Amino acid sequence: IDYLGYISLEWVYRWSKDLDSAGIVIPQFANYMEAYRPTKKLDLQMDSRGTGYYPWPKETLIDLTFPDVLDRVCELFPNQYAFRYTELDYTRTYPEFRDDVDNLARAFLAMGCKKGDHIAIWATNVPQWYLTFWAATKIGCVLVTVNTAYKIHEIEYLLRQSDTCTLVMIDKYKDSDYIQIINEICPELKDSEPGKLNAARLPYLKNVITCESKVPGCFHWDELHEIADKVPYSEVERIRRTIDKHDVCNMQYTSGTTGFPKGVMLTHYNISRSEERRVG
């Protein structure tokens, strides 16, 4: 395929119940494309050791925090793309992505975020989602993931119950207008100075960051690099050294089938082990 982007393959068991492994499906797809379609193979991206191996031996426990994992990958694959969006203007190698993460971490600190604080992300599959997660983990904050389909009562409950201090959000998704929703929950926002929100219904929320439109009372994503200049990188590194693999780094809310949604607290170790089992 003469295509510079990427192809995603989805294997759904119900479509082929006689197959018990996606390991059968994907090689057969590659063989078909090679036999019947004009293809162009790309060279394998080698690691810095020239081995092409995994960063860790398979079946080995990843005993590191997320910042340590990112540093390891940057060292081994300095020229490999971490992100290459086809429709959004965001292409970064791993070291370039880490630089963006560090700058966002500095901006969070400049806004008053501290180790243990909760930062919520209300967005789809955009670069800001990943940057927010990795920046939060770098300074010991907890990322609160928000369902993109949430309506006003659901997001208000989550932000209040999670004690979120900073919210990063896109403008809208499908029929949910996030800006309208947050202004309805926090009518004080439009008259507030960015970073100094004092909302009666969400007393812990101080910072709202918009990724697209500029909204009164909110920081805009493009302004964050200037805010980051107020904090030296050494402060990020100082906090990073205090983070333990058993520290909570992510709060995911349940669906609330039998009651109100509950926040599930996940540590660096929980997630790295879960991902290792999923892709290993």
Where in the sequence are the language-model features?
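AMP-dependent adenylate-forming
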Residues: 46-47, 69-93, 212-216
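Conserved pre-ATP/AMP-binding loop-to-beta segment of ANL
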Residues: 78-81, 201-205, 210, 216-253, ...
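Conserved small/polar residues in nucleotide/adenosyl-binding loops
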Residues: 254, 276-280
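Flexible, non-catalytic linker and terminal segments flanking ANL/adenylate-forming cores
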Residues: 40-64
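Conserved AMP-binding/adenylate-forming core of the ANL superfamily
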Residues: 62, 79-134, 151-156, 220-229, ...
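Structural core segment of the AMP-binding/adenylate-forming
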Residues: 139-226
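Conserved S/T- and glycine-rich ATP-binding loop of Class I adenylate-forming
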Residues: 119, 136, 248, 254-257
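Histidine-acidic metal/acid-base catalytic patches
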Residues: 1-40
